[in-house]
Amino acid sequence: MFAPRLLDFQKTKYARFMNHRVPAHKRYQPTEYEHAANCATHAFWIIPSILGSSNLYFLSDDDWETISAWIYGLGLCGLFVVSTVFHTISWKKSHLRMVEHCLHMFDRMVIYFFIAASYAPWLNLRELGPWASHMRWLVWIMASVGTIYVFFFHERTGSCVQFLRGEACPKAGTACLPARYKLVELLCYVVMGFFPALVILSMPNTEGIWELVTGGVFYCLGMVFFKSDGRIPFAHAIWHLFVAFGAGTHYYAIWRYLYLPSTLQTKVSK
């Protein structure tokens, strides 16, 4: 967040690519350029994610590998598909307020399940200690809790039913997007992203650890841009790219260290 302070893009020729920053309790409205970039930067990865997920499925040797490939693939593809659909509707059909709101909620919810799905192959296919094995189901509880939080606190102070009916906030003049809820949501993503990693790092087999760390660094760097709408042009699209780089690095680790070795040694593909 320090970089934007060093350079005020609103005073440069790049100002036309972004709107002014809004208060923390309001949602930033992207420019037409930013809308297009937000859609393209995740739409581009839909086909590769489908192909990559299919590759893991065909490399699977047993039921656990197959199940893990399905879980991870659905989480990976779901992330890019839901994000692309939401940003497209937000750009071209913003007058469909209820549809846009629901898709925005799904866009936030799917992140929790993507995080859980990204850990699934490691937790299902690697040897775990007695206490660490509980993380297999704990990570899904965390994703469910995050989803419930989004449902009740995303972009409103009034009830979900009131918002979806198009009714005004119960208190005129109050913010419908409390800043504290956005901060808690971001902290939830960070905690859920790092907490299961403690188990991964404690596994006897440490192959793939550096790739996992590298992917995590991409996500962390991307968060700088995630919170920089109105400060940096195309900030959200840049965040999308960091997500794609992080996901790609983690995919490589899963493919290389959980699926490829057994393929080279033992089997014929399905």
From Swiss-Prot:
One of its GO terms (cellular component) is perinuclear region of cytoplasm. Shows restricted expression with highest levels in brain and testis. GO terms for molecular function: protein kinase activity. InterPro entries: AdipoR/HlyIII-related. Keywords: Golgi apparatus, Membrane, Receptor, Transmembrane, Transmembrane helix. The keyword Oxidoreductase does not apply. It is found in: Golgi apparatus membrane. Its main location: Golgi. Pfam families: HlyIII. Residues 1-38, 87-102, 154-182, 227-233 are cytoplasmic. It is a multi-pass membrane protein. GO terms for biological process: positive regulation of neuron differentiation; positive regulation of protein kinase activity; positive regulation of Ras protein signal transduction; regulation of protein localization. Residues 60-65, 124-132, 204-205, 255-270 are lumenal. The chain crosses the membrane at residues 39-59, 66-86, 103-123, 133-153, 183-203, 206-226, 234-254. Belongs to the ADIPOR family. This is Monocyte to macrophage differentiation factor 2. It comes from Homo sapiens. The lineage of its organism: Eukaryota, Metazoa, Chordata, Craniata, Vertebrata. The gene is MMD2.
